[in-house]
């Protein structure tokens, strides 16, 4: 789905949609946060989209339907920020992305035409990942820095919201980063240790060629083939409704312990190894999540998070 288009684009029924009246009913609830969101936008050098903006409405309907359909309204979208690439560095990043898209399109054997033709030939798609505030700031300023970048297709933002409370800032805001990605020719990636394409033939990795749940962009490509474009700011109702929030969340030790019941010994050892690396600050939280997803698969991970989260909620 191309969010950069401003025309009224209907959401595929299979992907889900939400009633616009829902956003209206939440308007009063979030009105006191407007100044805070503008502050975040200014801090990141982004522009906050007005709620009547067509791009805002498209992203809101699409993203809200995915979050609510899986997590029973545990998440609320409170603002959407856009990267306008207004600075000289931003302009350079945008131009570089366009040049690489044309290059990948030519490599596929397609003749470059207009932007739409280039995007189709280079298989430019949208992907998303959950990020912490400081990670987001670093990405927008300096780019991505992990060994590989694992993103979810834009029709499955739930996959990015693992361990949500640990990714919140002090105001309970989580950030979902939507980026344009040059996928080019993809290969199926099974090994968690693979950190670059198996050959020059490939531009990206996926967990499945037919129904991918993960887009994998290598460190050699992540700052040329990925363009951060939108930030969706999300807040949980439990935080909004309580003066001193104690919203249920899943810590990594609890999550790892629950997942271990379904994995073999080598997978468990690998997960504990990665968690130790995170504790020693050798890998970021974002990279730990990416490695965890690669080992367990998203389906199992989502089931565990929902199951444990419901138990924690009952206990509280």
Swiss-Prot record:
Lineage of the organism: Eukaryota, Viridiplantae, Streptophyta, Embryophyta, Tracheophyta
Residue ranges occupied by any PARP catalytic domain in the UniProt entry: 28-255
Biological processes per GO annotation: cellular response to hypoxia
Protein name: Probable inactive poly [ADP-ribose] polymerase SRO4
Function according to Swiss-Prot or TrEMBL: Probable inactive ADP-ribosyltransferase that may be involved in stress and developmental responses.
Domain RST: 243-314
Pfam families on file: RST (PF12174)
InterPro entries xref list: Poly(ADP-ribose)pol_cat_dom (IPR012317), RCD1/SRO1-5 (IPR044964), RST (IPR022003)
Compartments where located: Nucleus
Chain segments carrying region Disordered: 1-28
SUPFAM superfamilies with a match to the protein in the record: ADP-ribosylation
Protein keywords: Developmental protein, Nucleus, Stress response
PROSITE patterns: PARP_CATALYTIC, RST
Example GO molecular function: NAD+ poly-ADP-ribosyltransferase activity
An example Gene Ontology CC term for this record: nucleus
Low complexity: bias regions: 14-23
